[in-house]
């Protein structure tokens, strides 16, 4: 027993069989065959110059026919007439009053139509792409848009949306600067690339810094002498004309004389025959870690030696002044020498000083 049946009138194209088909009950399964477009109708629409519309209608009707499940559906604005063979076939299926040859002819027509439907359904997957290409060419030529298949229209809209989004993204990325494009949200690979570039730049800066540290070590003696201020001498006054051992020590420190070379003993301009009693200790080129400690100990030794010289000068009796007082220059010359603690006049051999210094070098080494 059929699920649903519907009574409707079937009209032939030539008007024949009008009385037979009126008021008959036809099963709904035959509505599938009623929606198959006639080949002559499709050819006439193409001959009119509207190829695009004809292909669109065929695709639309095929889609409606595939959706049909036995219930008759609305066809739309383009009504199609029912085939007389189908109506006779349905009448023969229900009633036994029809003749056999028209039924065979109707079955042959139905089989032919089914073959055409199968061929068109095989061609259907390639149809939307070609139709979308034709539609794009027509749209570029500024022609009015007509009927478009449903599947092709959806595909075109999706492609247009994706193209529009890609174009907007390219414009947004291109409008930004070279450093801002890496900070876009969602751009994971670009962000990682930016981080790699930053790390490489930091590594290069660290390598340059290490090279500078190697080329210019921190224990540079010239740099330490420039940064370290000399200790002020309590016995040295700028107004004194006579220059004592303090100036000799400062000169040997600034010139940086080597330990192996003998020291240059400079004779003061005020008293040329006078020489310092204590030998001048040479400066040593020591490493940067022990240089400052050795300098402090060196100054302590110098202070101790100067104190001893002052004590010895106080213990020695002063030379008697001349009775006539004809040479006041000597007294005026001796007055500024007392606070400076000038040593008494003594003679010594320079070779002995060199030997003492060598002995000290050996003891230090």
Swiss-Prot record:
Q: What InterPro entries does this protein map onto?
A: DUF4657
Which intervals carry biased composition (Basic and acidic residues)? Answer: 326-340
> Superkingdom of the source?
Eukaryota
Region (Disordered) spans which residues?
119-157, 216-298, 313-365
Know the name of this protein?
Uncharacterized protein C8orf58
Species of provenance:
Homo sapiens
- Tell me the name of the encoding gene: C8orf58
């Amino acid at each position: 027993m059929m699920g649903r049946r519907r009574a409707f009138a079937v009209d032939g194209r030539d008007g024949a069989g009008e009385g037979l088909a009126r008021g008959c009950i036809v099963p709904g399964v035959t509505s599938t065959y009623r929606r198959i477009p006639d080949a002559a109708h499709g050819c006439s629409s193409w001959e009119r110059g509207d190829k695009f519309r004809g292909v669109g209608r065929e695709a639309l009707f095929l889609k409606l026919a595939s959706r049909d499940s036995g219930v008759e559906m609305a066809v739309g604005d383009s009504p199609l007439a029912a085939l007389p063979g189908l109506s006779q076939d349905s009448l023969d299926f229900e009633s036994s009053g029809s003749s056999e040859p028209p039924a065979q002819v109707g079955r042959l027509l139905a089989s032919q139509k089914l073959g055409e439907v199968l061929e068109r359904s095989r061609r259907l997957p390639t149809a939307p792409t070609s139709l979308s290409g034709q539609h794009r060419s027509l749209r570029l030529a500024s022609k009015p848009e007509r009927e478009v298949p449903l599947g092709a229209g959806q595909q075109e809209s999706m492609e247009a949306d994706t193209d529009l989004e890609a174009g907007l993204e390219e414009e947004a990325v291109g409008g930004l600067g070279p450093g801002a494009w890496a900070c876009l949200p969602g751009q994971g690979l670009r962000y990682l690339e930016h981080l790699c570039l930053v790390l490489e730049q930091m590594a290069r800066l660290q390598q340059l810094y290490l090279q500078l540290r190697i080329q210019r070590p921190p224990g540079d003696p010239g740099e330490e002498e420039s940064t370290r201020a000399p200790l002020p001498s309590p016995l040295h006054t700028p107004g004194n004309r006579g220059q004592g051992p303090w100036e000799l020590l400062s000169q040997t420190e600034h010139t940086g004389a080597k330990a192996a070379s003998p020291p240059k003993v400079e004779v003061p301009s005020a008293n040329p025959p006078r020489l310092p009693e204590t030998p001048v200790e040479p400066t040593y080129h020591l490493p940067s870690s022990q240089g400052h400690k050795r300098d402090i100990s060196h100054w302590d030794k110098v202070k101790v030696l100067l104190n001893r010289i002052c004590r010895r000068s106080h213990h020695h009796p002063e030379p008697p002044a001349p009775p006539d007082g004809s040479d006041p220059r000597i007294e005026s010359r001796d007055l500024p020498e007392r606070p400076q603690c000038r040593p008494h006049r003594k003679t010594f051999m320079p070779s002995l000083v060199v030997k003492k210094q060598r002995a000290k070098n050996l003891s230090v080494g």
